[in-house]
């Protein structure tokens, strides 16, 4: 969990410090106040481009120095539970008209205690420099590292209004969603996915060159794709199996049970390497690689109604997606010993009162949950303490 969050020149926040407790963190304020911007900042403490998938240059505050910083202190959730914090009312300052140059990213010292288990407070930070606005910097305990290293210390899952149509969106969006779920259970997944994509881009460029491509170089790239692609496929399928089993075993409740399956390419290292070697001419003509795990789709069904999620009503699709995320959060906590941080943007506003109350009951005592809404009344059903933050007031 995050025990401290500092934003410097991030979106509309010039200089913002929050001290959230464990459990519920409720952000309320008018539209445009910067609630989702805070969630986006938290989401950058995970590998990837954050919950908006925006370019880094877009995140720096307009009128600022052209850079931004997001810093946080991570604390073991198990040590904070029942410690008496919470019920803390923090007033987030309104965006400033001007601000000094952003502070440098923290340079805290100390040794990391253990991979994947936070034994003591850990300082993490990410951001950019004005001289390189599209180059992301990541630091853990003051040491510069890669974004993929963040997953060893913190798992973050999110739901946003933009994901409401996930089941009818292009397959690539569902693959991206599945990859985030997989990464939480298999930290090496990000490495394999990045290496696979890099090798595939290099192969595509080589096939597009005029003249006869270098066969040995093609074979070397295809061997890399086969090695990392098979690992990507295996991790995804393991996640689908584990999560699908958990969903199927759940009792009927306010969130319908979802069935999960993968459709498309499947195979091991040998199968993928053979497929790639045999499809060079076809891929060259198409201008892209047509076989491999990048062509897989996540198929979701409404189990209780035995029909595709894409055919469900808008309300049912939202409830199915929320049920998947909740089940996955339980699975992560069970298998890693640390509950994930959940970011739920405007989720409460789209649920009826009974489902909203059921959501709060389900999430109580299960880690840190950040939620946004325009009205305080949306969160009246929270039973217990919460950090309530008024944004932009």
Model regions: which residues?
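Nucleotide-state sensing region of NTPase/ATPase domains
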Residues: 46-78, 85-100, 112-173, 177-189, ...
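Walker B catalytic acidic pair
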Residues: 345-347
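Hydrophobic/aromatic beta-strand patches that form the interior of the parallel beta-sheet core
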Residues: 157, 370, 387-390
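Conserved NTPase motor "head" modules and their coupling/switch loops across ABC/AAA+ ATPases, GTPases
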Residues: 1-30, 44, 61-65, 76, ...
